[in-house]
């Protein structure tokens, strides 16, 4: 990701009058999710949420939604999902992984780590198998990062201490863009 950001900055410098949203550092990113995504989730669930699970790419979605949900109910548990092969949030080191959309190999400035109650690292294999299973069994075509988030949510739901709890998982994209990738190559 660092290389892509560096290249974007080069293009910005070469094109006077252009603008770069800088989604990894722009406070408008989490603010948008605080203003829209968080309230939508709260409303759709009738305020009954025990755990919220989302992958961490820019950190904006997780941070904005978490801030909103915790203001409504401080007991809501916020669960961040990261690649097992690049577990920076868990205190590990950056590394290559296949979970496009999460695990930028640095901790984004837009991520408010104080709102995260738990971090679940997910392997490429578990994310891929979960995304494929979701498509085959449920008819819902989700992407790689969605597979990781769903794997984490399913793992949480299997924990006896979470029996009867409402777990909300954010599935950020469709699997259409991954149809020709390793995700659906099998």
Predicted segments — roles?
Residues 1-51, 82-135:
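Small/polar-residue-rich loop-to-helix segments that shape phosphate-bearing ligand pockets
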Residues 6-8, 15-23, 142, 150-166:
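Structural signature of the thiamine diphosphate
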Residues 50-53, 77-84, 165-172:
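Beta-strand segments within the central parallel beta-sheet cores of soluble alpha/beta enzyme folds
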Residues 51, 76, 81, 140-142, ...:
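Terminal helix/beta-alpha structural elements that buttress the NAD(P)+-binding lobe
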Residues 55-66, 145-153, 178:
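Short glycine/serine/threonine-rich phosphate/pyrophosphate-binding segments
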Residues 66-73, 157:
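Surface-exposed amphipathic alpha-helices with a cationic face
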Residues 154-186:
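Phosphate-binding loop/pocket of nucleotide- and phosphate-handling active sites
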């Amino acid at each position: 990701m660092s290389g892509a950001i560096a290249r974007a900055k080069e293009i910005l410098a070469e094109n006077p009058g252009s603008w770069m949203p800088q989604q990894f550092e722009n406070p408008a990113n989490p603010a948008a999710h605080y203003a829209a995504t968080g309230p939508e989730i709260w409303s759709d669930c009738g305020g009954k949420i025990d755990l919220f699970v989302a992958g961490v790419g820019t950190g904006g979605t997780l941070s904005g939604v978490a801030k909103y949900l915790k203001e409504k109910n401080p007991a809501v548990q916020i669960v961040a999902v990261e690649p097992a092969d690049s577990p920076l949030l868990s205190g590990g080191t950056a590394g290559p992984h296949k979970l496009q959309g999460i695990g930028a190999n640095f901790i984004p400035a837009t991520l408010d780590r104080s709102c995260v109650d738990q971090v679940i690292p997910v392997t490429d294999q578990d994310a891929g198998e979960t995304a494929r299973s979701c498509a085959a069994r449920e008819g819902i075509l989700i992407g790689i990062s969605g597979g990781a988030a769903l794997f984490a949510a399913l793992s949480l739901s299997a924990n006896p201490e979470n029996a009867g709890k409402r777990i909300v998982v954010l599935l950020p994209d469709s699997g259409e863009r991954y149809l020709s990738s390793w995700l659906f190559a099998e």
